[in-house]
A protein has these predicted regions:
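Long, contiguous binding/interaction regions
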Residues: 1-83
């Protein structure tokens, strides 16, 4: 099956779902090339987390992960496809 290289950008506004996010990412670990997480304290506001996931996977796996992340409260994501 053909695979694609993608970057999944994730913003975590509500840390209550972070354990579920980590469980999802663990389920797709075979496709994940790398992961970078950055905590960020917004001026006068709460902390958010910015996470970048590089992955190579079939498009159905990419869509499935993105859809599952999108169902988590307080967490948003976007997928950018290479080429």
């Amino acid at each position: 099956m053909e695979t694609r290289i993608v970057l999944v950008g994730i913003i975590v506004n509500d840390r209550t779902e972070i354990s579920r996010l980590n469980e999802l990412l663990s389920q797709y670990q075979d496709y994940i090339i790398g992961r970078m997480g950055l905590p960020h304290h917004m001026h006068g506001e709460k902390e958010i987390s910015i996470i970048s996931i590089a992955m190579e996977a079939p498009t159905d796996k990419i869509s499935a992960l993105s859809g599952k992340i999108g169902m988590l409260k307080g967490i948003s994501s976007k997928v950018v496809y290479a080429g």
